[in-house]
Amino acid sequence: MRHGKAGRKLNRTASHRKAMFANMAASLITHEQIVTTLPKAKEIRPIVEKLVTLGKRGDLHARRQAISQIRDAAVVSKLFDTIATRYATRNGGYLRIMKAGFRQGDNAAMAVIEFVDRDAYAKGAADKARVAAEEQAVAA
């Protein structure tokens, strides 16, 4: 029985999951919005929210903890300098997950995960897809 076991395995080993979540967190912090499957989005949300809380603490130990998880100094500096200051007055709830239909190849449920008050000029993959879809709708 699997009672009391939190988290999803996502058909990956523990090391693969850890690396995947680190890469997804770095991409989400860099682009402020990513498109992924719904289960991955639900799993990455608490990881990134905890990283933002570390960024809000702002001390050296918090920065080292963030670097140990993300392993990209440029992303950590953006987290601590830009994102943490943006959410200085907000107590949690930094991310939103919006369902985005189903992937054509395998019908997997897709989702857009983004920062709540994100920079509108930080164009993520979902923005480019949305703009292309709007242009096709206008042309049709």
From Swiss-Prot:
BP GO annotations: translation
Entry protein name: Large ribosomal subunit protein bL17
Oligomer and partners: Part of the 50S ribosomal subunit. Contacts protein L32.
Residues making up the signal peptide according to the UniProt record: none
Gene Ontology CC, one term: cytosolic large ribosomal subunit
SUPFAM superfamilies: Prokaryotic ribosomal protein L17
The family this protein is said to belong to: Belongs to the bacterial ribosomal protein bL17 family.
InterPro entries named in the record: Ribosomal_bL17 (IPR000456), Ribosomal_bL17_CS (IPR047859), Ribosomal_bL17_sf (IPR036373)
Keywords, sorted A to Z: Ribonucleoprotein, Ribosomal protein
Molecular function (Gene Ontology), one example: structural constituent of ribosome
Organism of provenance: Rhizobium johnstonii (strain DSM 114642 / LMG 32736 / 3841)
